[in-house]
Amino acid sequence: MVNIFLIIVAVVIPALVALGSLYLIAYFQHPDDKNVAYFPKIIVILGITLAATSILMLPLDVANQGGKGGFPMDILWIVIYIVVAVFAIVICPFAMFFYESEEADPAAGSQIAGAFKGTFAILFAFAALTIVLYVFFGVAEIPTIVILSRFQIINYPIATDSINITTTLPEIASIVGGGNDKIKLDPGNPELLGNGSEYVEYRLDKEFLQFRVSIALFIITMVAFFGWLLFIIFGGIGLVALPFDMITDFKNRPQRIPYDKYLERKKKIGERATELVDVGKTIQSRTTGGIMSKRDRRNYNRFRQAIFLLEEDYERLKISYKRQGGKVILYYAQFFGGFIALGVSLGWLLHIIIYMITAPEPFHPFLNSLVISLNNAWGFLGVIVYGLLSFYLLFCVVKGNFKFGLRLFFLFPIHPMRVGNTMMNAFLFNVGLILITSVSITHFCTMAFSQFTSTTSINSLFETAVKNLKILKWFWVVYIFAIFAMSILTAIFLFIKPKDKPARIRV
């Protein structure tokens, strides 16, 4: 029977997320995008709603309790993740390419054609890689314990701590494979096991059950695989960078300055702007037909980073003089929020150490105990805490992506989210990133809260099929260590070089 309350929750939560997404666009969008770019805005709203829904489906799966709530969760998970894949690989890139088309050519057909070309390139690369890997490695190998025989000894109880038992019955010797009439049944022997209930089993635990997974499940695996790569890099960086920047921004907050100081700093910013204009013209002159060399693309990414830092410095200068330092209470709120974020990040890292790395026999359940206790006290408390912890990981991914592009390798242009100054291409890029990593974050949370999610459909999907695929299964062994290691390396790097500085552009 379908649980009416769960249906209401399943409808209301996505609706609230969609409304929140609409407010997010209104709050962050650039003035140039007001009353225009409706198609990208619709994609952003749907993408954020889809990502949030996929993460919040985990507590719904728990509440459903293996089908007692009436939802076919195994089917719903497959459907939601296929839709996530379509949005992340096709729809978001298409909307982004369409938005970024050259304004000099106003023909809608030209914009659509350009968007189709870019999207097709991404889709073709993903499809080709998926098909090749599916043909060779689309087989799951599930370790199994094969019970060759099982019998009961009558009137002779066996305790797990008992001494070896000797029997002279030829029948029993034949069952367990003995060559003589006498055989010892040892409860401590991994092949001849007594379970403390008068039963003895002869086991062979080196067998693997092999089966080819469906193409839909393998597509989900590929999305999860790439999501994990991004989550390891950006999530690991963001776990440290998010609280670090919130706290250090308070230290470097705009201070009230006199007029002469304002003019001096404004002059320096103007000189930097003039230099960047010349650099931009040089980069543009070396670009033919929209095609950039690897070196020019790196310079272009460095150029965008320098522009961003210049705009940040100018905004701080305006706040320091024209607004006399701004609203101090907001900086204090961010400062205390940074310590809250620090506590959450430390909580996640500690949970990784004492529960996830030490599995299957963890030192302590830690966050599992918190979520389960709150869930037992009142179901929504556990869901709220789970939602906050999982969405915090999404924020860390977005922050880590921005920090990565700003400070490290400049492999792709930065797409910062700034209040009242965020273009739609930045929205679309970050939504695509959130969609891809939402799959890996759900997988991560399934393992992190395994005591909370042990009977769920998503746990069976990830732990049975996805985690046991050929070749790829070795990747799942190291990713938890990789996230922790990335966070430690980021902490060391940020303490050595805490300030963002413009990169040197070699044109």
From Swiss-Prot:
Any coiled-coil regions, as ranges: none
Principal location: membrane
Cellular location(s): Membrane
Lineage: Eukaryota, Amoebozoa, Evosea, Eumycetozoa, Dictyostelia
GO cellular component, one term: membrane
Protein name from the UniProt record: LIMR family protein DDB_G0293610
Residues spanning the membrane: 4-24, 42-62, 75-95, 120-140, 215-235, 335-355, 378-398, 427-447, 476-496
Keyword Chloroplast included in the entry's annotation: no
Record's bilayer topology term: Multi-pass membrane protein
InterPro entries per UniProt: LMBR1-like_membr_prot (IPR006876)
Provenance organism: Dictyostelium discoideum
Alphabetic keyword roster: Membrane, Transmembrane, Transmembrane helix
Disulfide bonds: none
Source domain of life: Eukaryota
Family the entry assigns: Belongs to the LIMR family.
